[in-house]
Amino acid sequence: MKVFSTVFLVAILIFSTSLVYANPKKSGITPEQEHMEMLYPTVLVRLARGSGSGTVIYSELNEEQEYESYVLTNYHVIQNSVKITKVWSSEKNEHVETESRLPVNIDLWEYNNFSTAIGTMGRIADIMAYDKSRDLALLRVKDRERQMPYVATLYPEGLDEGPWIFQTVYAVGAGLGKPPFPTMGLLDGYGSDQDGKELYLSSSPIIFGNSGGRLYVFSPRRTYELIGVPSMVSAYGWGNVVSHMAWSRPIAEIRIFLRENKYGFILGDEPEPEEEEVEDAS
């Protein structure tokens, strides 16, 4: 009986410690920190038809002393700016597909008293990479002279600390084209889409326009860190939306997307060496 009690007590302690680690206490966290880390990195992504959300995930000086600033969003938010047309190739003697990418507009909000949106600052961005199957896209801001003032922190790699089910999460986006606002819920489960790509299920409500925003957790590092990109909501019947059953593209898929498209430096990877051209000796 004593052995059973001891094992049971150890199990309780381990479980309790895990829950505390998953949801660290936020004592000492100020509203200013919550605004700067969750709200302010959000942008509105505007196209000629429709809009969605985006998140600034990188803004640093490059070797030419110009600012490289990148915004993460969903592919379906910017898909109308990707044009595929067929043209005749006299060289191949057949029709071939060509792709063109139109620039998109992004709006950053300005605030009074931390929370009151008073207007936006516009920027133009180019579509640098996209992945239909993962529903992710990366935009680069054309403005090279000014650094983006607020950048989201990505959830670190290689840490055995979640995200876990029951962890408190925050969804932030520009729903319906309005100034960004947060909703809170739990990480409820894991799933996959029809292509087998992993998804997070959360009870943080999202609505139309939240796509391309982000899902946050408060980490043991006492910062709010991005763990996913809200992508879709559950529905039943004829378009009956269940906003508190929200699906997000997880941070693991985001890392794969960035690395496959040679943007691993955003994750802190060392720059890949350029391939040397081999001269033809003949």
Q: What are these model-derived regions, one by one?
A:
Residues M1-V7:
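Positively charged n-region of N-terminal signal peptides that target proteins for export
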Residues T30-P31, T42-N74, V241, M245:
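A conserved glycine-rich beta-strand in the N-terminal activation segment of trypsin-fold
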Residues E60-E68, T116-I118, Q194-G196, F218-E225, ...:
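Short, solvent-exposed loop/turn segments that connect beta-strands within catalytic domains
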Residues Q33-E34, G52-T55, E60-N62, V82, ...:
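Active-site substrate-binding loop(s) of clan PA
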Residues A22-Q33, V82-N113, L226-S282:
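C-terminal cap/linker of serine protease catalytic domains
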Residues V7-S16:
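Bacterial N-terminal signal peptides
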Residues T55, P205-P230:
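Catalytic nucleophile loop of clan PA
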Residues D126-Y130, P149-L199, I206-G212, M232-V242:
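Flexible, gly/ser-rich surface segments that form the specificity/activation loops bordering the active-site cleft
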